[in-house]
A protein has these predicted regions:
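Conserved helicase ATPase motor motifs in RecA-like P-loop NTPase domains
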Residues: 1-3, 116-117
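Conserved AMP-binding A3 loop
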Residues: 2-17
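Conserved AMP-binding/adenylation subdomain of ANL enzymes
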Residues: 16-33, 41-82, 97, 152
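Short catalytic-loop micro-motif centered on adjacent basic/acidic residues
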Residues: 35-36, 60-63, 85, 110-113
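Gly/Ser/Thr-rich phosphate-binding loop
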Residues: 81-86, 95-166, 179
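Short Gly/Pro-enriched turn/cap motifs at secondary-structure boundaries
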Residues: 165-174
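Conserved beta-loop-beta connector loops within the AMP-binding
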Residues: 174-185
Length: 185
């Protein structure tokens, strides 16, 4: 938010439920590696890049400074990072960093943006440089923090019908077990 900082009270159950919901969507593989580069003083960083891998038993690689694109790239390459969380701002830095080579992300299978609106030009430039789609999510600290996320579209092999889970300009589908209501105040 842009106002004065406020404390938000979340229970252990809030956090663990959100972690479980995210885990169900990401369908972890036994060899997955998550890059932990988001600050843990922010609910998105604490939940998805710190608590999620710890609770789900996923290997985690930590980088202290997410704005240091060269180090982020090196860590992704060295440790075969497969899941990358970030913000539009950080992804823009990676695109612009000449030391961040596209092959450094060759093991990444999922890139998810949160904490701020994913800018269309960032999404496009990231795909152009790295060949990877960024899936945008939505949440707030009060939602512990993820409420919805775009995911890759799926094709039913029997009917060849495409199921759309990724819509440009949208924040995606609600997490499993989540009901969202939009109201006009």
């Amino acid at each position: 938010s842009e106002g004065d900082p406020k404390g938000i009270e979340l229970s252990h159950k809030n956090l663990l439920t959100n972690i479980k919901q995210i885990g169900e969507l990401l369908n972890f593989h036994k060899d997955d590696v998550i890059l932990n580069s988001l600050p843990i003083f922010h609910s998105f960083g604490l939940t998805v890049t710190t608590l999620l891998p710890l609770c789900e038993g996923i290997k985690m690689v930590s980088v202290a400074d997410p704005t240091d694109g060269a180090t982020v790239g090196k860590m992704c390459a060295r440790h075969r990072v497969s899941i990358l969380f970030g913000t539009s701002t950080f992804f823009r830095l990676y695109v612009r960093n000449k030391k961040f080579h596209p092959l450094m992300l060759q093991n990444v299978r999922m890139v998810i943006a949160g904490a701020e609106k994913l800018k269309a030009d960032v999404k496009e430039a990231f795909k152009l440089k790295f060949g990877l789609e960024i899936y945008e999510g939505y949440g707030a600290t009060e939602t512990a923090p993820v409420a919805s996320v775009n995911m890759p579209n799926l094709l039913d092999p029997e009917t060849l019908q495409e199921f759309t889970f990724n819509q440009a300009g949208s924040v995606g589908m609600p997490l499993p077990g989540t009901i969202i209501k939009i109201v006009d105040l």
